[in-house]
Amino acid sequence: MGASLNEIKTKIASTKKTSQITGAMQMVSAAKLQKAESHAKAFQTYAEKVRKITTDLVSSDNEPAKNPMMIKREVKKTGYLVITSDRGLVGSYNSNILKSVISNIRKRHTNESEYTILALGGTGADFFKARNVKVSYVLRGLSDQPTFEEVRAIVTEAVEEYQAEEFDELYVCYNHHVNSLVSEARMEKMLPISFDEKGDEKASLVTFELEPDRETILNQLLPQYAESMIYGSIVDAKTAEHAAGMTAMRTATDNAHSVINDLTIQYNRARQASITQEITEIVAGASAL
């Protein structure tokens, strides 16, 4: 019985240490989430302004823009930029988006020649490699608050591959941050660029004289616009990652506390049984006298 008590005490001590670690990781993730949400909010304000200016420019002429970034072409090949984390301990964050991507590929494509994958995050890259799915570009090791410079390589690669007609449409696949408890898998079509023009927004630049001409400006602006929108998805995904990490660590901490409570009850019962046994033996010994 004594050995059993010591064993339970060891388990309790070990689980307490685990709960302290997961609790600390939860606090770290919460701090990262707060910072990421502020970053995402600031970028969203910027993105809305950029989109408004670009929409106004596209709508500044009665003739539709003829820029290749906006023209739909026959889809012979699709590009998927898949955003995952580099590490685990983030609950179902990675599995949700990867399941969504695989399901979509199986529905839309019959062979690998019809699509290409760019992987941002080690988990996604390793996932596709393990399944012998070709990945044309991989970027690992993003910081907790990624700057555009960190992701410039893969973002520029995606846009340039589209411009070179290596694929005919681009989807960015990521987890959208809803709140600290909820994220949703998204597959957003980024290329070709499409604008939902509202009546009150149209013609806001019609009276402006553009130097040089509109098409020349769009040739420079639209690739940068596409890159900024893709970067916005990366910022959003990173925010969702921190939220998933915080939730996973909170769940782990709660589970550890539950295990500690169960072990404590088990320990008390075992200790009570041990004491009862000792008393019984003492009484039996006294009776024998």
Curated annotation (Swiss-Prot):
It is found in: Cell membrane. CDD domains: F1-ATPase_gamma (cd12151). It comes from the Bacteria. One of its GO terms (cellular component) is proton-transporting ATP synthase complex. Transmembrane segments: none annotated. InterPro entries: ATP_synth_F1_ATPase_gsu, ATP_synth_F1_gsu, ATP_synth_F1_gsu_CS. The keyword Ion transport applies. Its main location: membrane. GO terms for biological process: proton motive force-driven plasma membrane ATP synthesis. GO terms for molecular function: ATP binding; proton-transporting ATP synthase activity, rotational mechanism. It is a peripheral membrane protein. Keywords: ATP synthesis, Cell membrane, CF(1), Hydrogen ion transport, Ion transport, Membrane, Transport. F-type ATPases have 2 components, CF(1) - the catalytic core - and CF(0) - the membrane proton channel. CF(1) has five subunits: alpha(3), beta(3), gamma(1), delta(1), epsilon(1). CF(0) has three main subunits: a, b and c. PANTHER family: ATP SYNTHASE GAMMA CHAIN, ATP SYNTHASE SUBUNIT GAMMA, MITOCHONDRIAL. Produces ATP from ADP in the presence of a proton gradient across the membrane. The gamma chain is believed to be important in regulating ATPase activity and the flow of protons through the CF(0) complex. Belongs to the ATPase gamma chain family. This is ATP synthase gamma chain.
